Amino acid sequence: MNKPICSTGLRWLWLVVVVLILDLGSKQLVLQHFHLYESVPLIPYFNLTYAQNFGAAFSFLAEKDGWQRWFFAFIAVAISVVLMVMMYRASAKKKLSNIAYALIIGGALGNLFDRLVHGFVIDFIDFYVGDWHFPTFNIADMAICIGAGLVIIDSFLSPDEKTIKVG
């Protein structure tokens, strides 16, 4: 059964491209203008700091022997494929879920690119209060988190299609 792409959630894949351009472009600027661990204050509580993340979120598993690079690459590909299938099966009118999936895919692919090309993910956004610093992150991480939040919001707003209607 072939459906026109514009009638499916895949219509929102343009957002994946936007996330990739913003993410990879910002990381390239960091690579060109920063040394590792160099930090530039922008405003109070916010620095740009070049860091290399060999693990996942919050450097989870970063201290392992290198197998995590391929593990997280596999996870990114698997999640991207599953979400694209879900988008294909969904109507283009399900904007919130399709936007959420596109943000997650864009973020996953942005970090996947880093893992495959550099062997690590380039992080540079550094929020802090006093001496406490939130783990450094990047635009791909933001897209994934925003997408995950939208999935949660959508689960509360969208009626459950499996619910049996009484009456």
Curated annotation (Swiss-Prot):
GO terms for cellular component: plasma membrane. The chain crosses the membrane at residues 5-25, 42-62, 70-90, 102-122, 137-157. It comes from Photorhabdus laumondii subsp. laumondii (strain DSM 15139 / CIP 105565 / TT01). GO terms for biological process: proteolysis. GO terms for molecular function: aspartic-type endopeptidase activity. Pathway: Protein modification; lipoprotein biosynthesis (signal peptide cleavage). The gene is lspA. This is Lipoprotein signal peptidase. It is a multi-pass membrane protein.
